[in-house]
UniProtKB/Swiss-Prot annotation:
Keywords: Ribonucleoprotein, Ribosomal protein, RNA-binding, rRNA-binding. One of the primary rRNA binding proteins, it binds directly near the 3'-end of the 23S rRNA, where it nucleates assembly of the 50S subunit. It comes from Planobispora rosea. This is Large ribosomal subunit protein uL3. Pfam families: Ribosomal_L3 (PF00297). The gene is rplC.
Length: 140
């Protein structure tokens, strides 16, 4: 059996709360994890290190640049919005086009998450620090 990758790409859907065994309310994050597809396999013989590149999320094929689009068409992979490379011990166990699902993790397992925040651009102090401002009437 192939050794599973301990990582998948996902999207935060929101927050909710659950009760633990002691009836305490615990905040939890809901994440749509996968399905990811293997888009590239790096081997020590060819690339000098062992890794697997994963793709996640759908994107309109017209928005993909020409070199990446040609590579994905050549390997019959639908275009993906996000790509990341995950190092692994033996990348030769994976094939291009193979799906990696969220069953990599067990229920209740703690995971490390790396995120990318939404950019808000250059903002003034009211938006940046959440100031409410004063009443908008005459004299103030």
């Amino acid at each position: 059996m192939a050794k599973q990758i301990k990582g998948v790409l996902g999207k935060k859907l929101g927050m909710t709360q659950v009760f633990d065994a002691d009836n305490r309310m615990v905040p939890v994050t809901v994440v749509e994890a996968g399905p990811c597809v293997v888009t590239r396999v790096r081997t020590p013989e060819k690339d000098g290190y062992s890794a697997v590149q994963l793709g996640f999320g759908q994107i309109d094929p017209r928005k993909v640049n020409k070199p990446l689009g040609d590579y994905l068409r050549k390997h019959e992979i639908t275009p993906r919005r996000y790509f990341t490379e995950i190092r692994t011990d033996d990348a030769s166990e994976y094939t291009i086009g193979q799906e990696v699902l969220a069953d990599t993790f067990e229920a209740g397992q703690f995971v490390d998450v790396t995120g990318k925040s939404k950019g808000k651009g250059f903002a003034g102090v009211m938006k940046r620090h959440g100031f409410g401002g004063l009443g908008a009437s005459h004299g103030t």
